[in-house]
């Protein structure tokens, strides 16, 4: 098959969507398919030329939260260029410029279109309109819902990563058909076996982490909806009982200055370290310096970094959300909490009982096998073939 993946974000940008697209592309290519990524040009000098990545010029978006992204205007003028690819199926991973182009290509070529819902915008109305979110939240949610619905309605199939999102789409009465396919991950870079003890020690030395320190880690976009402040508050309390501890926060985002200010106000910068952006190829090594993974977000559609942490044999201690029921077994490979004081108690408990930490760690890596990128690609391949077959039969009847 010749597959066109339309995405607003791609390498060198780093995000959950980019990770999903990269893994899908590599997985499908391993199955023998020809895969093209159609995406805006991120900048003039920060990407490698790849004939399978079609880059389209766009305008800088003057919003701090969308740094690195580009707005492509009048996308339909690029439809003719896409026709030269002779695509069999279109797979859309965005709701904006490239999504509109993907819909136009599928319609013009009369081929199936698939939409993966990465973000339910009704949980992120502050990105749609801060004014409406503040003064008319119901109107903001209604407007946000239309962003997703234009794709669920017009694509042949919408992929959602979890049953939670599937149920939500049905409950909110979004148009279209839905199927559940968890996004896949290239698990190998996160396995402990991928690194030598010398590599891990070198990173610890670089960060000033002693071997006897207990280390918690978070890898996330630094944004309001991630509730990272709750983790900071809890870790400060935990540190009072176990001062031989460290919390490493990896990631960047619009709320990083706010987070740094909070840490400074708690006089915690000595043991809570925000490292900012880390290259994607190096993230797997950073997981190896930690003992546990923490997260307090309840707005995840699938939680790819959670699976990465589990693949690195890290128990995850996370605020409960039913999206995590798919891969977290409370007390087996992770621990759920709801309130900050519960998180503090859990941290103290596993610090006092290292055998519990060992059991959780042992079970963590095993639980990630269903999320391998090979499984993800095979599931998408099966879906594409089914949609192509149905579409061909429909066209032959006309």
Curated annotation (Swiss-Prot):
Its main location: membrane. Gene3D superfamilies: Glycogen Phosphorylase B. Pfam families: Glyco_transf_4, Glycos_transf_1. SUPFAM superfamilies: UDP-Glycosyltransferase/glycogen phosphorylase (SSF53756). It catalyses: a 1,2-diacyl-sn-glycerol + UDP-alpha-D-glucose = a 1,2-diacyl-3-O-(alpha-D-glucopyranosyl)-sn-glycerol + UDP + H(+). Keywords: Carbohydrate metabolism, Cell membrane, Glycerol metabolism, Glycosyltransferase, Lipid biosynthesis, Lipid metabolism, Magnesium, Membrane, Transferase. It comes from the Bacteria. Its cofactor is Mg(2+). GO terms for molecular function: 1,2-diacylglycerol 3-glucosyltransferase activity; hexosyltransferase activity; magnesium ion binding. It is found in: Cell membrane. Glucosyltransferase involved in the biosynthesis of the non-bilayer-prone membrane lipid alpha-monoglucosyldiacylglycerol. This is a major component for maintaining a certain anionic lipid surface charge density, for balancing the bilayer to non-bilayer phase equilibria and for keeping a constant lipid bilayer spontaneous curvature (curvature packing stress). Catalyzes the transfer of a glucosyl residue from UDP-Glc to diacylglycerol (DAG) acceptor to form the corresponding alpha-glucosyl-DAG (1,2-diacyl-3-O-(alpha-D-glucopyranosyl)-sn-glycerol). Belongs to the glycosyltransferase group 1 family. Glycosyltransferase 4 subfamily. PG could also protect the enzyme from proteolytic digestion of the proteinase K, possibly by orienting a lysine-rich face toward the membrane. This is Alpha-monoglucosyldiacylglycerol synthase. It comes from Acholeplasma laidlawii.
């Amino acid at each position: 098959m010749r597959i066109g993946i339309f995405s607003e974000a791609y390498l060198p940008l780093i995000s959950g969507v980019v990770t999903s697209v990269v893994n899908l592309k590599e997985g499908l290519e391993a199955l023998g398919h020809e895969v093209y990524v159609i995406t805006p040009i991120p900048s003039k000098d920060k990407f490698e030329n790849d004939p399978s990545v079609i880059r389209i010029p766009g305008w800088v978006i003057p919003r701090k939260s969308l740094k690195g992204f580009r707005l492509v205007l009048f996308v339909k003028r690029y439809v003719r260029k896409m026709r030269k690819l002779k695509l069999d199926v279109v797979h859309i991973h965005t709701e904006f410029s490239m999504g509109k182009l993907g819909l136009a290509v599928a319609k013009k070529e009369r081929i199936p279109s698939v939409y993966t819902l990465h973000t339910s915008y009704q949980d992120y109305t502050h990105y749609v309109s801060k004014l409406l979110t503040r003064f008319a939240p119901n109107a903001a949610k209604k407007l946000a819902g239309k962003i997703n619905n234009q794709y669920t309605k017009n694509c042949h199939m919408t992929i959602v990563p979890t049953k939670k999102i599937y149920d939500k789409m049905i409950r909110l009465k979004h148009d279209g058909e839905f199927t559940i396919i968890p996004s896949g991950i290239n698990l190998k870079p996160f396995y402990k076996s991928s690194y030598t003890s010398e590599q891990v020690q070198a990173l610890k030395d670089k960060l000033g982490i002693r071997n006897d320190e207990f280390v918690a880690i978070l890898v996330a976009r630094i944004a309001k909806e991630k509730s990272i402040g709750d983790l900071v508050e809890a870790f400060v309390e935990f540190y009072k009982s176990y001062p031989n501890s460290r919390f490493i926060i990896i990631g960047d985002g619009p709320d990083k200055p706010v987070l740094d200010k909070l840490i400074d106000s708690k006089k915690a910068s000595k043991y809570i370290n925000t490292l900012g952006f880390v290259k994607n190829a190096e993230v797997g090594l950073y997981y190896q310096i930690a003992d546990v993974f923490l997260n307090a977000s309840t707005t995840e559609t699938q939680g790819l970094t959670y699976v990465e942490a589990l693949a690195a044999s890290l128990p995850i201690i996370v605020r409960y959300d039913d999206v995590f029921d798919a891969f977290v077994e409370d007390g087996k490979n992770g621990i759920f909490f709801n309130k900050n004081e519960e998180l503090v108690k859990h941290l103290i408990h596993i610090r006092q009982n290292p055998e519990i930490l060992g059991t959780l760690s042992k079970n963590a890596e095993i639980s990630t096998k269903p999320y391998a990128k090979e499984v993800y690609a095979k599931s998408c391949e099966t879906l594409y073939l089914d949609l192509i077959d149905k579409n061909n039969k429909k066209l032959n009847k006309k």
